[in-house]
Amino acid sequence: MDVKTYPVLEAAKNRTLLDNETYLKWYQESVADPETFWGEHGKRIDWFEPYTKVKNTTFEGDVSIKWFEDGLTNVSYNCIDRHLKAHGDKTAIIWEGDNPYLDKKITYNELYDTVCRLANVLKKHGVKKGDRVTIYMPMIPEAAYAMLACTRIGAVHSVVFGGFSPEALAGRIVDCESTFVITCDEGVRGGKPVALKENTDTAVGIAAKQNVTVGKVLVVRRTGGKVGWAPERDLWYHQETAAVEPHCPPERMNAEDPLFILYTSGSTGKPKGVLHTTGGYLVYASMTHQYVFDYQDGDIYWCTADVGWVTGHSYIVYGPLANAATTLMFEGVPNFPDAGRFWEVVDKHKVNIFYTAPTAIRSLMGAGDDFVKRSSRSSLRLLGTVGEPINPEAWEWYYHVVGDERCPVVDTWWQTETGGILITPLPGATDLKPGSATRPFFGVQPQIVDGEGNVVEGAADGNLCIIDSWPGQMRTVYGDHERFIQTYFSTYKGKYFTGDGCRRDEDGYYWITGRVDDVLNVSGHRLGTAEVESALVSHQLVSEAAVVGYPHSIKGQGIYCYVSLMAGEVGNDELRQALVKHVRSEIGPIATPDKIQFAPGLPKTRSGKIMRRILRKIAEDDFGSLGDTSTLADPSVVDDLIANRQNRA
């Protein structure tokens, strides 16, 4: 196919940290001798005790991943204390509220004071090194304070996205046996309140029935809305932090001590607790933040993600703050009060680096260019995308209309499991191709394998694996190392299997083609089909459900549900709406089904396996190439599904 290439821009060449020659040299060193390469770059963070061992990893057998394993450090020290002398009065966090008239700036000195106070509150209430703290918060500075306060005392945080339901929150509290929750009275999104404290109360009740008792709930006052109160359990954040000292010594943490758990969807029902550890993660998050975004002192950097996702962990909080950057936290949504909001914020705060998701770009593109044109955006120097592959049309619009053809676009590919960006352009080094994540970051060795596991060289399509470790890699699934091995290392022995399909072109550029397992990517957020299916089946009228993705013009993938009802029940629009509501309450708004097709039967093999390939084709309105249906127990169900499909071109 004919692909336009955009050479490195002159402006990027002139002020970049890395040119192509340096990229090629460093990359070669990083894969030929990772010990020496990372031994050097590990020094970018401060260590209380320097490491002598750099890399100790194996993808075979009882998979074990250790980096800098005898070093001692602390994440909050690296994100705050070490900057105070030179950058104490510099703005660490710019907070932009949901309401365009609400904003505030927090300096590194203020960040130190607040994080130390919150760390002392945690200690006062018995939280110790290794304890798990659940953070269920909107995008307010206190969410970042909570994360950093946990790292200061060595507690392990588990941030749960504020859009998740009480049931989803409870499941995550129970899985890591968390006994302390930090939340807020209400969140605000697009002008509407989100009942976080109420959801927390419900979740804590559900957890108690599963023998996990949350001892304390710390509540930040965001709206002043009325909330239920359990006097023995609930604490007001403002009262507690005012009553303690603004100094708290950082805990000396081993590089391999757990840092955080973040739950992500898998192809089987229960979300996995992805465990990241301290040293390697921070080295990798800070290094990728610096070089991928060409971050230089004085830049104003804005990643539009939520701290409930890994992008918020690595590229709103830890990466930028470790680099003494000014990071912008945005509470709102791209289209409130209208579709010009992002660009107004860019002008208001003179943002230089802007990192968002293709789904937001597609939706703003659909709103028209006028919303973009009424802002100047002259401060912008670099644009980035994250969360899913970006289609070339959206890339071109982002580059030409938003960036005025003067900002490189870094299309970054990575995962919750990888801790940081793995495949990406570097602004001063990489010629760009719309839709391609281009080349691997330092130390990352991609490999494409076919369905049988044979390595394919040169220009090829297949499944994307990574053949050696990098410091930001997850270490295990919390409490279930066997699941970690089975999920990521059993499909192709000795290789980390990403679950993504991939194409490599004749220039060695990588193009991510999307998930090859039963995981959906909806608006850049991963969602297991099994999770949605089990939510549907938990409704009393549903006997069976199968969920697949289909192309969606804004979200990338939409959620298409085939639902078989209990004997004697008949599907109608009222039931359709009830099922949509049911899924939202079980998982959260993110899992809202786009299409529900009532199906008397599902295409199954004689052994009872649902043929999802066929369901995908029908959902895509493409049933000319269904392939061999002779293995189905009842081939006639296919005709019925086609006749009643919901997604007609």
UniProtKB/Swiss-Prot annotation:
Its cofactor is Mg(2+). ATP binds at G387, E388, P389, D411, T412, W413, W414, Q415, T416, D500, R515, R526. Catalyzes the conversion of acetate into acetyl-CoA (AcCoA), an essential intermediate at the junction of anabolic and catabolic pathways. AcsA undergoes a two-step reaction. In the first half reaction, AcsA combines acetate with ATP to form acetyl-adenylate (AcAMP) intermediate. In the second half reaction, it can then transfer the acetyl group from AcAMP to the sulfhydryl group of CoA, forming the product AcCoA. InterPro entries: Ac_CoA_lig, ACAS_N, AMP-bd_C, AMP-bd_C_sf, AMP-binding_CS, AMP-dep_synth/lig_dom, ANL_N_sf. The modification N6-acetyllysine is found at K609. Gene3D superfamilies: 3.30.300.30, N-terminal domain of ligase-like. NCBIfam families: Ac_CoA_lig_AcsA (TIGR02188), PRK00174.1 (NF001208). The keyword Ligase applies. Signal peptide: none annotated. Mg(2+) binds at V537, H539, V542. One of its GO terms (biological process) is acetyl-CoA biosynthetic process from acetate. This is Acetyl-coenzyme A synthetase. Keywords: Acetylation, ATP-binding, Ligase, Magnesium, Metal-binding, Nucleotide-binding. It catalyses: acetate + ATP + CoA = acetyl-CoA + AMP + diphosphate. Its EC number is 6.2.1.1. The keyword Ribosomal protein does not apply. It comes from Sinorhizobium medicae (strain WSM419) (Ensifer medicae). GO terms for cellular component: cytosol. GO terms for molecular function: acetate-CoA ligase activity; AMP binding; ATP binding; metal ion binding.
